[in-house]
Amino acid sequence: IIDYAAKSDAATPVNLTSHLYFNLNGNASGDISGHRFAINSSERIVTDRNLIPTGMKAALDGTPYDLRTPTLFSSISDKLENGFDDYFILETAAPGFMDAMAYSEKSGIEMRVYTKELGIQFYTGNFLDGTVAGKSGYRYGRHGGFCMETMGYPDAIHHAGFPSNVLH
């Protein structure tokens, strides 16, 4: 469980998240090509070539970004330019409804994500290149792990159509 809190005495933009990497096969087990992912989302935030939100949204139907059913990463990774580094807008659901999941058939481990946040930044380690040492000195290569970062809309302060992330 990850639980954050913030307090301020003035209006302050706040968008707390965590950039923890996971590989459900364990440390030093290669890439995440054998993982299945699901996210309860029908839209994502569009970004420019520098991965900065443009303020636009894109429907996911019929695209490799549609992860409403568990999808094997290796079956769609070649359809994406680099993998995922995208903010998925979560569907409104009842409290206690699972917002996302990851599963490895190899290990049998399933990770479930529940959040009160509006979305998830889903990242598949596209820029991991083996230069940074992780646990036990293992060097993680491209797609060596994934992140599911629950948070409010990224860059909301610059887009009037996005829900505000300002703490009052």
What are these regions (language model features)?
Residues 1-168:
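An exposed, glycine/acidic-rich loop-and-rim segment of catalytic or binding clefts
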